Amino acid sequence: MRTRILTLLLLLFAFIANAQSTYVRLVTNRGNITLLLYDETPKHRHMFVQTIKKGLYNNAQFNRVIKSFVSQGGELDETILDREKQHPEIPIQRLAAEIKPNLFHKKGALGAGRNDNPEKSSYLTQMYLVVGKPQTDEQLDALEKKKGIKFSSSQRNTYKTTGGTPHLDNDYTVFGEVVEGMEVADAINSVKTDKNDLPLEPVTFKPVILSKKQAAKFKAIKH
């Protein structure tokens, strides 16, 4: 009887955890990318959902694309900082970092952009998708020594095979990942850019929050 009750409770907890998962589709002019927003970073998840609902990402562009590194979208640093400079009466808005050791910059990771600040707090309207490249043990060893961090064996394997940008770990908040459409993210990361990393042809995107029915196909995916 106890075993049966325990099994039912575990199933209930699993159902609740899945029900809380949030998925967002980036509808781009190069194809669609589906993202899972992590439950472990609730403030960033909520922030991204709210900015989408407010339309702050409507007509957004990937405006900083660096091949084999990241594709950054939303507002540029210069736009945000200039607005803050021109309107000192408006309090500067940042989101406290939610940096977790198990949420790392593997290929497909969704991160929050930021300026150089000691709190590592995030912008509200800037995100990036990691493409990166495979790393060697020597490179990872050097990063561990330089940054005072430790990569798990699983993280090492991911960085050595799939790739990513491990030098960003422990400095920027990772709050989601690509679960569908990585080939689109790769294509965007390969577009031609000018000297400022701006795509020569605009790459636009609009985030759309998926309904429970639309998200159901992704429920079995674990990061």
Per-region residue spans from a language model:
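Hydrophobic h-region of N-terminal signal peptides that target proteins for export
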Residues: 10-19
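Residues at the start of alpha-helices and the adjacent loop-to-helix junctions
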Residues: 6-11, 168
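Positively charged n-region of N-terminal signal peptides that target proteins for export
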Residues: 1-5
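Cyclophilin-like peptidyl-prolyl cis-trans isomerases
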Residues: 18-223
